[in-house]
């Protein structure tokens, strides 16, 4: 470990001004391990100089484990140029002082150094974790750990300030600058949209000593909180397409999930760290084969360390290892990361392995390599990821159009039965080969063979595909796939009469349910038509029928958060009693529900007015006691709050 510290410190290792600091550091094994085994150590001289600065001002921190860990985390996060030493000093001082006064969440004391790095880094907006902001937020929002996923709503969602200035322009906050102690206080009074609300939620958690981070999504900002040991919960989130603003390795959710899984095995992290340090030292001594063996030992101990994998693969490239070495490494990598972490495995293969071996490989060999990876997938693993980009990348490297079509056809046979991968694969092929009649014909034949029916060709394929894929996409919260397949299948049905033709007045606002997804109890039962589910949430209409039982239910997942003005439900003439006494519940996360209304009496049309309370939600659930439910239309109206 001492050699590793020397390499990290650079020239300052031999600087007599730091002699006492290095003596204190090297005399404390726990401190050395916290520094070296808590994720990447980058910009080493700057990291070490800052840690020395903190120790020089307060040598006692070395004997206070919590403060020592926080100081180390602050130093490690100075790896990036967008944080300066004085700013980070104030961060350390805040946590040291508030911990001493017992003002932080009790989880703070139990955090490991790698988790404290998220406290040190802070959210996207640096001003939201200034000392003034942190103190304000801790005083204003001091809740149980799990509740910070709702802290974003302390600020109102407002697209325009009281003067009518848009949040998209600089004038939105300009009149109020200097009137408040800090930006979070100003936002609570003035308002904001997704960026401000997400930073509010993450900064509030951080102010109380709870790890959190902000992240970008398509057209939206969200955040995540470590709501329990080892559990990161997305908050104010609309999509699996997340770009993290704070990360140990890559800024993807899958990479973050892998880091948590790795650190859950703390003893393995430390043992693998020792082997990795040995490998680096042996390579520096020119003992390449021994270094190779040490790296393999490190990865055998802990194959979930993404940073170690990158180092080892670069080691192989640096020393021009042969094809057999790369094949063995592929096997070890896939055994370590699949099926639980397919995104990380794919990125490592694409960026580091295939770049070294595909150049001279035949189409047959390339296809074999890709199929070896794909065969080990079992659903999404740790979460939905951009597998479409992987399919595109492979497809471009398996030969001409005929060979590409054959590759996809074979993959379709293997993927179609997967409830996770099947729907997005069908959606991807439909888009990718939209103008290729030969490919579409081949795909239709495969789908027909799966349904074991014959008849109407393309329409039958579409109907059977939607019948299977729409419930699967809704269950996976994959709104993109639900929308793509649902819209395609909608041409199989005539639209229902418009609300105007039926004499029904919509509620104010926009149709929030448009673009969402519908889940029901036991889809595909003998009365249900899953291929018509998409239209239920649109004015054109569709149909669904729950199973018969003690408590039938259905859920609507909105494509964004909304303040709900009202809900319109259309029943079936002659069976209007199916909605009587049903309860309407709303939720922000699909887990915790609040009842907001009851359907009174038996009617063909229900118009549920929620304008007095305007509940904020992303999920709507309708349930009743006994029998079943079926509605051709469930239309949710209101105003966006994301």
Question: Model-flagged regions — what are they?
Answer:
Residues 3-186:
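Secondary-structure boundary elements
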Residues 155, 159, 173-174, 188, ...:
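His-Asp-centered catalytic microenvironments across diverse enzyme cores
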Residues 178-185, 190, 195-270:
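Hydrophobic/aromatic-rich core segments of domains that either
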Residues 268-286, 302-318, 341-359, 368-371, ...:
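Amphipathic alpha-helical repeat scaffolds of TPR domains
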Residues 290-297, 324-337, 364-377, 404-413, ...:
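Alpha-helical repeat scaffolds
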Residues 302, 333-340, 377-381, 415, ...:
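Alpha-helical junction/boundary sensor with strong preference for TPR arrays
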Residues 493-561, 572-578, 598, 633-642:
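Disordered, acidic Ser/Thr/Pro-rich linker "stalks" and the adjacent N-terminal cap
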Residues 547-552, 561-562, 573-642:
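Trp- and acidic/polar-enriched beta-sheet ligand-binding modules for extracellular glycan
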């Amino acid at each position: 470990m001492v050699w590793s510290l020397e390499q990290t410190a650079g020239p300052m290792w031999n600087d007599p001004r730091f002699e006492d600091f290095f003596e204190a550091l090297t005399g404390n094994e726990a401190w050395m391990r916290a520094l070296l085994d808590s994720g990447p150590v980058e910009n080493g001289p700057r990291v070490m100089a800052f840690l020395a600065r903190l120790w020089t001002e307060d040598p006692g921190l070395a004997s206070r484990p919590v403060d020592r860990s926080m100081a180390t985390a602050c130093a490690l996060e100075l790896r990036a140029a967008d944080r300066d030493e004085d700013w980070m000093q104030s961060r350390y001082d805040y946590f040291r002082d508030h911990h001493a006064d017992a003002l932080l969440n009790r989880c703070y004391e139990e955090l490991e150094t790698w988790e404290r790095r998220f406290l040190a880094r802070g959210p996207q907006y640096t001003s939201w974790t200034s000392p003034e902001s942190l103190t304000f937020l801790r005083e204003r929002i001091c809740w149980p750990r799990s509740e910070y996923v709702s802290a974003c709503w302390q600020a109102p969602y407002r697209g325009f300030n009281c003067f009518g200035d848009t949040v998209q322009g600089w004038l939105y906050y300009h009149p109020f600058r200097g009137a408040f102690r800090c930006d979070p206080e100003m936002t609570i009074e003035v308002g904001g949209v997704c960026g401000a609300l997400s930073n509010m939620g993450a900064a509030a958690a951080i102010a109380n000593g709870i790890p959190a981070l902000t992240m970008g999504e398509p057209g939206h900002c969200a955040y995540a909180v470590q709501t329990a040991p080892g559990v990161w919960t997305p908050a104010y989130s609309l999509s699996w397409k997340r770009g993290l603003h704070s990360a140990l390795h890559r800024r993807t959710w899958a990479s973050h999930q892998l880091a948590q899984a790795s650190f859950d095995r703390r003893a393995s992290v430390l043992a693998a760290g020792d082997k990795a340090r040995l490998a680096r030292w042996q390579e520096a001594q020119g003992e390449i084969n021994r270094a190779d063996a040490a790296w393999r030992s490190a990865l055998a101990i802990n194959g979930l360390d993404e940073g170690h994998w990158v180092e080892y693969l670069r080691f192989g490239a640096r020393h021009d290892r042969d094809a057999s070495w790369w094949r063995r490494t592929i096997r070890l990598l896939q055994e370590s990361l699949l099926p639980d972490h397919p995104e990380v495995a794919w990125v490592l293969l694409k960026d580091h392995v295939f770049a070294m071996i595909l150049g001279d490989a035949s189409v047959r060999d390339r296809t074999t390599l890709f199929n070896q990876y794909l065969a080990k997938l079992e659903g999404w693993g740790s979460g939905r990821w951009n597998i479409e980009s992987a399919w595109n990348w492979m497809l471009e490297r398996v030969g001409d159009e005929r060979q590409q079509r054959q590759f996809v056809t074979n993959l379709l046979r293997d993927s179609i039965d997967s409830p996770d991968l099947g729907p997005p694969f069908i959606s991807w092929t439909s888009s990718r080969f939209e103008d290729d009649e030969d490919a579409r014909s081949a795909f239709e034949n495969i789908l027909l063979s799966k349904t074991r029916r014959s008849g109407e060709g393309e329409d039958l394929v579409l109907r059977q595909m939607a019948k299977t894929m729409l419930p699967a996409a809704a269950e996976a919260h994959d709104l993109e796939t639900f929308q793509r397949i649902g819209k395609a299948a909608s041409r199989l049905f005539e639209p229902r009469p418009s609300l105007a033709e039926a004499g029904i007045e919509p509620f104010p606002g926009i149709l929030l349910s448009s673009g969402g997804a519908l889940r029901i109890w036991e889809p595909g039962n003998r009365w249900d038509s899953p291929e018509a589910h998409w239209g239920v949430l649109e004015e054109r209409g569709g149909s669904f029928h729950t199973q018969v039982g003690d408590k039938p239910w259905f859920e609507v997942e909105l494509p964004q958060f909304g303040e709900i003005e009202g809900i319109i439900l259309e029943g079936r003439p002659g069976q209007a009693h199916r909605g009587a006494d049903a309860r309407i519940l709303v939720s922000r996360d699909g887990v915790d529900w609040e009842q907001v209304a009851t359907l009174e009496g038996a009617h063909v049309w229900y118009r549920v007015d929620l304008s007095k309370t305007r509940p904020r939600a992303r999920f709507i659930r309708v349930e009743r006691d006994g029998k079943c439910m079926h509605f051709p239309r469930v239309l949710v109206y209101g105003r966006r709050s994301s």
